[in-house]
């Protein structure tokens, strides 16, 4: 199904019973978080708070609180179809040359579609129907959530930050949380390896001392939002990928104060700059780890202009101990990751990021083992293949007879096939999430790989155990008489 903008998605979700309007006045400070958290844990609907306390702008929360709604946002009615999205990305990441005329003919529609999905720039857009400038720019007029009691200030969570490096044609879309520190000031918390931070660094090198243009789009259409959190190949822009998902070009409009292009249907857009020398201490905030994080220094984003649709919707979320919305997104994107990994490592059978592992900190992989040491190759492959797995602390590899999504089977393999000294791999001084306070140094820590596969000659000197299985004929006989047993 195609959704033209966020409002269209909201309307369709409401028809499906996947969205609930809340008419009762609810405070953006703490109350919305508590309500959204209870609903998410129950597998409930998206929420539209129509009367946020002290504000006229409604708040949309828990939008991607189920795997089904993530799939719907990507244009798929069935979550199982997310594997097809992954296959498309795998092909676009490493396209294979045609094997013949027929193969070329079969692949041409996909290639043609990609070529035709460059974003379409429009002159006027809904996101610029209303404009706040000068003294009218006041972030307190927006119902920005204050999520947890220990949070230092309200926090923008679902903003799509748009940047462009000085030597790049394509823009970068990233989602970075932003702490409110004044009527027109936000702290831009982007990590050093993320696209926005890299663009900013390159701009500083190319134009020392000059302000860096930034735009933040709130309430874009679901395909564009999800495109910003999906491992899109570097050769493809997030806008192109969003166009592929919805089957129509992404309409963008140039900002009023700079040349950056933002989704034309966005509900709210923040335009402004980052001055190279202006930084501030960010946090503490409750995060997806379930803890409050440390304070760190990040650049300050000065908002010079706010544009919006008439009667805008403010899109928001919270992060906390799993499950939260990022954890659910991780489960859904898990299905996208599998074909990408299998394209590079055909021996991988399945890949699972347990939501309890804070979205990405632990991965369980099943594989068709072909030689001694094969599991270690897969571990290093997963760590290095996609940027999304740079911060994965634990990788556990099993044979293909283990269902990696069944924790009972994983524990059985772990406790029967692993010798801790032989089968545990430790890698020190690797990049670690700055929010991971367990590491001895901020941003730098160790990783562990666990080989829970059956061991081959060369890996063990002992005779390896044979799994117990019942005789097939006996099982068939018992199946035949089962109803007669009265059990």
From Swiss-Prot:
This is 3-octaprenyl-4-hydroxybenzoate carboxy-lyase. Keywords: Cell membrane, Decarboxylase, Flavoprotein, FMN, Lyase, Manganese, Membrane, Metal-binding, Ubiquinone biosynthesis. SUPFAM superfamilies: FMN-binding split barrel, UbiD C-terminal domain-like. Homohexamer. One of its GO terms (biological process) is ubiquinone biosynthetic process. InterPro entries: UbiD, UbiD-like_C, UbiD-like_N, UbiD_bacteria, UbiD_Rift_dom. It is a peripheral membrane protein. Prenylated FMN binds at residues 175-177, 189-191, 194-195. One of its GO terms (molecular function) is metal ion binding. Its cofactor is prenylated FMN; Mn(2+). Pathway: Cofactor biosynthesis; ubiquinone biosynthesis. The gene is ubiD. Catalyzes the decarboxylation of 3-octaprenyl-4-hydroxy benzoate to 2-octaprenylphenol, an intermediate step in ubiquinone biosynthesis. Its main location: membrane. Its EC number is 4.1.1.98.
């Amino acid at each position: 199904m195609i959704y033209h903008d966020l409002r269209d998605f909201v309307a369709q979700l409401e028809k499906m019973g996947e969205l609930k309007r809340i008419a009762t006045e609810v405070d953006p400070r703490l109350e919305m978080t508590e309500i959204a958290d209870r609903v998410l844990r129950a597998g409930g609907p998206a929420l539209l708070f129509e009367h946020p306390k002290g504000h006229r702008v409604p708040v949309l929360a828990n939008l991607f609180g189920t795997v089904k709604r993530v799939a719907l946002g990507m244009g798929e009615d069935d979550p199982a179809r997310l594997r097809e999205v992954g296959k498309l990305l795998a092909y676009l990441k490493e396209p294979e040359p045609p094997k013949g005329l027929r193969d070329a003919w079969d692949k041409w529609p996909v290639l043609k579609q990609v070529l035709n999905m460059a974003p379409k720039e429009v002159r006027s857009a809904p996101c610029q129907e209303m404009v706040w400038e000068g003294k009218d720019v006041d972030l307190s007029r927006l119902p920005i959530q204050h999520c947890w009691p220990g949070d230092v200030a309200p926090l923008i969570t679902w903003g799509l930050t748009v940047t462009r490096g000085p030597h790049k044609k394509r823009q970068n879309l990233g989602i970075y949380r932003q702490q409110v520190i004044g009527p027109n000031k936000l702290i831009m918390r982007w990590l050093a390896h993320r696209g926005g931070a890299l663009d900013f660094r390159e701009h500083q090198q190319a134009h020392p001392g000059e302000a860096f243009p930034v735009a933040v789009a709130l309430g874009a259409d679901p395909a564009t939002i999800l495109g910003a959190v999906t491992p899109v190949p570097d050769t493809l822009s997030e806008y192109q990928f969003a166009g592929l998902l919805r089957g129509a070009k992404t309409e963008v409009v140039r900002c009023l104060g700079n040349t950056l292009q933002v989704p034309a249907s966005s509900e709210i857009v923040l335009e402004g700059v980052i001055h190279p020398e202006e930084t501030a201490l960010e946090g503490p905030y409750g995060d997806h780890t379930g803890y409050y994080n440390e304070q760190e220094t990040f650049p300050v984003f000065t908002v010079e202009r706010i544009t919006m649709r008439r009667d805008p919707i403010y899109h928001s979320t919270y992060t906390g101990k799993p499950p939260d919305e990022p954890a659910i997104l991780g489960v859904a994107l898990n299905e996208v990751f599998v074909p990408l990994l299998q394209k590079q490592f055909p021996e991988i059978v399945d890949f699972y990021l347990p939501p309890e592992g804070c979205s990405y900190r632990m991965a369980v992989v099943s594989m068709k083992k072909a030689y001694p040491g094969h599991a270690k190759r897969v571990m290093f492959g997963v760590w290095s293949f996609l940027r999304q797995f740079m911060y994965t602390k634990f990788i556990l590899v099993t044979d293909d007879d283990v269902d990696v999504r069944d924790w009972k089977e994983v524990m059985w393999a772990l406790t029967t096939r692993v010798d801790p000294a032989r089968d545990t791999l430790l890698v020190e001084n690797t990049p670690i999430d700055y929010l991971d306070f367990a590491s001895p140094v901020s941003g730098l820590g160790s990783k562990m790989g666990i080989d829970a596969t059956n061991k081959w000659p060369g890996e063990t000197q002992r005779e390896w155990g044979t799994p117990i299985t019942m005789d097939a004929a006996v099982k068939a006989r018992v199946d035949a008489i089962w109803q007669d047993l009265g059990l």
